[in-house]
């Protein structure tokens, strides 16, 4: 029974819901009014009933006409880049841009074809002495040269054995009487001498036995004078030999040398300024090299080549510019200047040097050059 009542109530409720839905649908389609919503007959028919409950929501109506477009919203965030599209057509050529910076230098190109030879330039100054080259192969023997000039007198040799007695010489001139010597001890009686000067007559004696005739004696005074002259000559020779030997010892301090004629050029291989070089040679009993002929210049050149150093000569023009003289003041009797020399370059070249090619050049005296002395 109770179940029946509940079922009826549910059905009634559903009926009211459908009715309400129909009314809402109708109200949306027609203009609502107080009469249509509340009353179905005139007011005079009776009192209005109580408001019923809202019915169930009716079915969804048809889609209405589109409304007016709303205002544009704000731009959203940019999306991700899309895929690259196909290449477009080439645009028109633009105006040239500003000049760019200079790029790095490229690698050097191959050498070009040699150009034609230029004109020969002027002759340059003589360069410095180069290093001594290696000795070349030994050449063939040349023709025999001329006999050279006699060399200097050599030092005295050792005393030889006594030679055989020579022939009697011619009596010399009478010398001055010498001083009386001290009386010597009595010697063995010699042979009878020649008769002395006649003495004063004595008392007449008894006649004696005649003696044997003695040999004729030699004259004394001429022989003494000759011996004195010989001794003096020997003393001079000894003095000359002593001086020569003393100079020879000094010369031997210079190990390298060349002789020509009566001259010897010597060097010890060291270099000095002109004034000091001059002093070294003077103390050794000589002077700086002073070649007075082509032969002497060639001999000096051999020393310069062996040492591979230019050497000072003794000549200067310190007294008169351009006029070179020997240390004695004499003018030059021989010269072998290089082309364009002397030129007094810099206004201070008052001394002379000799190169390995034998040519001369004026040089400042303060420079250091090889010391070569002449004896």
UniProtKB/Swiss-Prot annotation:
Disulfide bonds join 281-373, 351-365. Glycans are attached at residue 90. Residues 116-132, 138-150, 173-189 have a biased composition (Low complexity). GO terms for molecular function: carbohydrate binding. GO terms for cellular component: collagen trimer; extracellular space; multivesicular body. The modification S-nitrosocysteine is found at residues 35, 40. Pfam families: Collagen (PF01391), Lectin_C (PF00059), Surfac_D-trimer (PF09006). Pulmonary surfactant consists of 90% lipid and 10% protein. There are 4 surfactant-associated proteins: 2 collagenous, carbohydrate-binding glycoproteins (SP-A and SP-D) and 2 small hydrophobic proteins (SP-B and SP-C). Contributes to the lung's defense against inhaled microorganisms, organic antigens and toxins. Interacts with compounds such as bacterial lipopolysaccharides, oligosaccharides and fatty acids and modulates leukocyte action in immune response. May participate in the extracellular reorganization or turnover of pulmonary surfactant. Binds strongly maltose residues and to a lesser extent other alpha-glucosyl moieties. PANTHER family: PULMONARY SURFACTANT-ASSOCIATED PROTEIN A, PULMONARY SURFACTANT-ASSOCIATED PROTEIN D. This is Pulmonary surfactant-associated protein D. It comes from Macaca mulatta (Rhesus macaque). The lineage of its organism: Eukaryota, Metazoa, Chordata, Craniata, Vertebrata. The gene is SFTPD.
